[in-house]
Structures are given as structure tokens and as C-alpha cells.
Swiss-Prot record:
Its EC number is 2.4.99.16. Pfam families: Alpha-amylase, GLGE_C, GlgE_dom_N_S. The active site is at D393, E422. This is Alpha-1,4-glucan:maltose-1-phosphate maltosyltransferase. The record marks D480 as: Transition state stabilizer. SUPFAM superfamilies: (Trans)glycosidases. It catalyses: alpha-maltose 1-phosphate + [(1->4)-alpha-D-glucosyl](n) = [(1->4)-alpha-D-glucosyl](n+2) + phosphate. Alpha-maltose 1-phosphate binds at K262, Q322, D357, N394, K534, Y535. SMART domains: Aamy (SM00642).
Amino acid sequence: MKPEFVLPAPIRLDRPFDGRRRVVIDRVFPEIDGGRFPVKRVEGDRMTVEADIFTDGADTIVAELLYRRKGEAAWSAVPMTHIGNDRWKASFEVGAPGMCEYTVQGWVDHFETWRKGLQKKLDAGQDVSLDLRIGATIVELGAARAKDEDAGTLHHYVGLLSVGGSDAAVEAALSEGLLAAMRRSPEKAMATLYDKILLLQIDQKKAGFSTWYEFFPRSWSEEPGKHGTFRDCIKLLPRIARMGFDVIYLPPIHPIGLTKRKGKNNALVAGPDDPGSCWAIGSADGGHTSVHPELGTMEEFEAFVQEAEAQGISVALDIAFQCSPDHPWVKEHPQWFRWRPDGTVQFAENPPKRYEDILPIDFESEDWQNLWIALREVFLFWIGKGVKIFRVDNPHTKAFGFWEWALGSIREQYPETMFLAEAFTRPKLMARLAKGGYTHSYTYFTWRNTKHELQEYLTELTQTELREYMRPNFWPNTPDILHEELQGGSRARFIIRFVLAATLSSNYGIYGPAYELCEHVPYPGKEEYLDSEKYEIKQWDLDRPGNIRSEIAMVNRIRHNNPALQQTSDITFVKIEVSQGQEHDQLMGYVKCSPDGANIILTVVTLDDRNTQGGWLRFPLEKFGRPHTERFTVEDLISGRTFEWNGEWNYVELNPHQMPAHIFRVNLPS
């Protein structure tokens, strides 16, 4: 039976109109595109919701945040707190991965309104006999709603209040016992329920904090020039684990086409021994659900995944929905591709560039439903082999509706699945992919290099609505991108960009071993590696002098030991001055704090990889409720040294040839 091809729509609550519902609920936050898309959190996070809630006049109101797992009937309720100016707030701890729903409701509390009015009249010395009898009527209605013991308690209070203006009646009216019993039996018949049920996507913990390492399996044979295998890669796992990575990302592991195969450095004609680009997927040996024969068997791949998991590492697979001309789909499903007037299949183009070894899939095919099913089956196949994380190649060049349908339906079956969107494209496209189901997003971090650029970009990612649904994953390099910042070959520059990625974002990755070996030679005139591993098998010397493997391992240990660095959004940039009133443009500092406030990390990085830089740093003591003159200590987790700081302004200095960064753990007096 074919699946239903329906995209989600905002869930609106069409309750019959009743003019007696006086409470107004407005500006619920977070809410993405009117409830069209889910907010995202990670299991164990707290989900905080705010809303404007008010009514006419001065009556007291009560509000609740409601939440439940999608598909459940009953709601859990959390009382909301008034935080000023008719703004209300509440939170709850999210559970296991899956989809949740939440909304808000509020109602007039006639008992609280009456009780407050009674107290004011008593304070003014007025007669309250009639008011007490009015209160008895309100409490009697509460008794009718109450259950078991509370019903009897409230009937008792009705008797006391009905007497009128006696001291006993007044005492009963203001008693905590009556208040507690009435709060347990609220009058919700005329409650206003927000007109939308909003969605909350809960992801596995690695969605919030992960450390990625990309490598090409074919380059890891112990025999020079020989094609590496999954068995060879198992031997790499301890080294990768020691560096502190918990996600291994493999470029496509499928059979590679022969037709129009690319040669070394993307040459149009391949030599007899050139392995081709692994993104030219498909040959007589199979397509997207097959492994390249020279890498090994499917059983050996599964063994690799299992061994990685045993060492605390998840395996992420690259999914590239494109085909070589030799892919079985070209013959089996020609309707999924575009054909030119001369009868040849349309290859990929970005005029004037031509990519004749790759065929794009036609998402306007008349057979689009079967196409969608087949593409989704690729994910499901690899999930069946133990893969839970996918990096998707160029998703912005495929139909957005497909991603929303496919990722949503996959997540319904396998809620722990993660998807990284490799989309270096326009901001609105990147945002839509994140809204439509992608767990992580590649970013513009690679091209943000000055202090102003970095701070402006991080502010956009963490202080706007983007923070509610788009999780950045920072990569200082990829097999496709060697930014000019790294082309100078400075070891310090590689450490600088690494530390920035690892401490600005809780999710980051590197393409290795090119990065830890400070590989920096570009193809002339391009942001690409010379002799790119995309087109050839490399033989790496992992112990090459000048590598930064120990620095990577150290910073990753710091990340794992400090919860403040395991989140992205709580970041405060600090002022660093070269002289009074003059901002330092080469020293950048930022503070992160764990959700419970117990772990505070201050990172200071020099952006100058050649010269020593120093300046006066202002630590934001007021953020932590401390006076500007507070004395405290900071421990540099890189050097192991501890410094005593006196007040908010303190001097910092970095020599890039020693270490271009401080990662301070801030210890404020208890």
C-alpha cells in the first residue's frame, strides 16, 4: 500500500464560539510560522513557553501550559507564572526523542478575584457580610467540581461562609486550606484554549552536542596505493576516539560509475587507476543500497558500525541523491531523469561548468510518488544496517516538500535519527531545510573570519528565532572547501579556526586527517585542495611533524568535561579593549554558561596567527548577579594555570606561537 503524501499543516482548534470566554491569549513563543513547523529541543532540555494572557477589567486569571506526546489524548499541565506586563511563562523537561504537542490555556479565577476583593474591603473597614455569602456560592460551585475529600472540605467551608459576617466566616474565607482546595478544583468551563496546537520535535542528545570527524575509507589501507576497506577502518577507531570524536562521517560508500569518470584534480579524463569521485554513485555493482566492492562486504560494513558504537562513536553516512550514468536506476527508472532532444540523459550543469559523471534526479517526474518512496527507502535501508545519522549532500537542490515528507515519516518510525543538511546556500533556503526536518545545518562559519563577522553571525544564530529550529554545525574545512584563511599554512591559524568552531558551536566537525595535519596547499586560484582526496586515494602520515592532534584531543576533552560548551545559544560576547574606549579587533572573547549555572566558561581567542596580542577584558559580572568589584579566579583549562582576577576588568595576552586561545573556567565565590 502506498503511503499518504500529505505535508503537515498547523493544527487549529475550532471550538464553538462562546462570548463568556473572556481571557485573551496572544503572542505565544516559541511558535514557528504560525505552528506550521516544530520547535526543536534535545531530550533532557527544558522547554520554556511564554504568552501574553489577559482579560478585560481587573479579574484574576490563571494560565497553564499543556503538553503531551503526539498521538496521546491526555494533556499534562504546568501552571504558568506572571512575569510582568501580562506576560506569562512556564517550562517542562522534555522526554525521549519523538514529537510532542503543546498549547496554552487560561481562565478567569472568580474565587481568587473574590478573595482579593474581600481582603481589600476588610482592610478598608467595610461590612463584608454579603460578600461572604457571595463567596459561599462560589465555593459551593467548587465543591460540585471537586472530588472525594476536597468536596467534603469545600462543603464545610460553604457552611462557614453562609453565616455571614462572623469572625469565623472571615477566618475561613482567608484560610490557606480553602485556597488550596479551590485551586485543586479550578473552574475551567469558560477557559480560553489557544487556537493552535504547536509542535515540539525532541531529538537525541547528539543533536545538541556532537563532535564529527570525516574521512575517506578508501585511503586507509596499510599498503600504499591499495584501496582501503572497512576492516582497515576499524583499526582507525581507537585513534579517532582518543581525539575525542563521537561521530564518524563517511563520504558515499557506494559503487562508483565508470562513464565520464573524473580523474585526479577533477580532470575530465580518468586514468586507468583513478578511483573516481565517490559522489558519482552507481555502477553495475549496484546503487544507493550497495557498498563499493573494494571497501568490503555489507557484513563488514555492519561490523564497522558495531565496533564504532562499542567505542562510543556513531557512524554517519553521506546520502547524495544523484547518479552516475551507470546507476541501475537509469535503466530501471528512466522516467526519474531528464532526457534531452538527442535522446541522451541530462547530466548536472552549473553553466558554464559541466559535471558529466553525475545525473541529477528529476523531482518533476510524472512518477514522483514512486521516486519519493524509493529515495526514502535508501534511508530506511541504512537504518536497518545500524546507521542513525545522515549527512545529506546538497539538499537545497531537491524538492523541499520531499524532505519534509521523507524526514518526517522516517522520524515517526525512528525518532532518534539525525540529518545534517550540507547546504551552503542562501539563508532562506537553509532556514527552510531546518524547519522541514533537518537536525543540523552547515553554516557560513567557514566564511566568517573577522571579529565583527563572527560576532554578528553568532548573534543571528543564537538571538533570533533561528535558535528555535536551526542547529548550526561548524566546519572549518571540508573535502570541497579549503578557505584562504587556511591556505597560508600557519599551524596557529588551524588551531584558531578549530578552537572557534569547537567553542562557539556545541556541534562541529573537521575533515581529517587533512585538518589535524594542517594540509593547506590549494588548487591554484580556488578554495579547494590541490590533489583532492575526492578524486584519488591518499596515503597519510598521521604523525607528520606540525600536526595539531594533541590540541584537538585536549579541546575535545574540555568540551566533554564542561556542560557550558555543550550548548550553543547561551553565549555572551565580552568587551576587550586595546586601550580605553578602543575595541580590540584581534582578540575575541565570549562566555558560555551551563543551564544550571554551575559551569561558566570564558573563551578568549586571538585572530592574529603571527603576533602576540594583549588587551583589557571586561567580564560581565552583572550577568551572574555579582558586583563589578568581585574578586574571583579563572582556571585556564589549556595551560592548567589559575589566575586571580580583581573586578570586571583584567588583562589577557596571547602568543599564537605558544597557544592562540585561553579556555577559562570561571570560579565565582559561593
